[in-house]
């Protein structure tokens, strides 16, 4: 490993630690992210007893929507506060969903352990989309379904993220823009 590699990993680690703080107050985003959940679940074709992983689950809106159909759902998020809120929401709604704190770039699940991997915006903030996608596909069963909601680059949030990337803290060389997930040519 070179000195540049060490620096790159250090920056990525710092990005993830900062993300835990930034996303711990998700209340600003809840109002305009929840409406996508039923659409993602329907698009994914989730059925009762499917094993489903919600990547970057936030407060659990998407995971709970899938659980209402009888799916066996695990919600994953990097931010401890969000995992706690998702767990509390699961209890309030009387739904059984396992929520775990983990990194999408190193998912703590066996290969081919989910029928469906879903995400509602959370996945797109992994600093290295190719690593995140590789992990999502690793835990997906053969012929499984992957479905997610993301903001396209040309709409408000995509433009906001582009400006933030330009003037925000420096990103590691391997980091890619979150809006790439919304570009059909890339995905």
Segments the model singles out, each with a brief description of its role:
Residues 130-131, 137, 141-187:
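Conserved catalytic/acceptor-binding region of the Class I
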Residues 105-116:
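A short acidic, Gly/Pro-enriched loop at the edge of an enzyme's catalytic core
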Residues 2-50, 61-65, 82-85, 89-93, ...:
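Conserved class I S-adenosyl-L-methionine
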Residues 116-129:
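A short SAM/SAH-binding and catalytic strip from SAM-dependent methyltransferases
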Residues 51-55, 59-106, 131:
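Class I SAM-dependent methyltransferase SAM/SAH-binding core
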Residues 45-47, 68, 127, 141:
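Short conserved AdoMet
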């Amino acid at each position: 490993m070179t000195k540049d590699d060490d620096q790159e990993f250090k920056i990525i680690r710092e990005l993830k630690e900062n993300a835990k703080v930034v996303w711990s107050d998700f209340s600003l985003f809840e109002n305009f992210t929840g409406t996508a959940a039923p659409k993602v679940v329907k698009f994914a074709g989730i059925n009762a007893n499917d094993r489903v992983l919600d990547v970057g689950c936030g407060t659990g809106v998407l995971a709970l929507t899938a659980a209402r159909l009888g799916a066996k759902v695990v919600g994953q998020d990097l931010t401890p506060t969000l995992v706690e809120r998702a767990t509390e929401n699961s209890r309030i709604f009387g739904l059984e969903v396992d929520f775990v704190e983990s990194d999408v770039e190193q998912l703590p699940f066996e290969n081919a352990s989910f029928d469906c991997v879903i995400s509602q915006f959370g996945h797109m903030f992994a600093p290295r989309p190719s690593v995140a996608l590789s992990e999502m596909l690793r835990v997906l069963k053969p012929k499984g379904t992957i479905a997610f909601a993301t903001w396209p680059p040309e709409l408000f949030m995509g433009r906001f993220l582009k400006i933030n990337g330009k003037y925000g803290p420096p990103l590691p060389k391997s980091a890619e823009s979150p809006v790439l997930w919304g570009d059909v040519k890339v995905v």
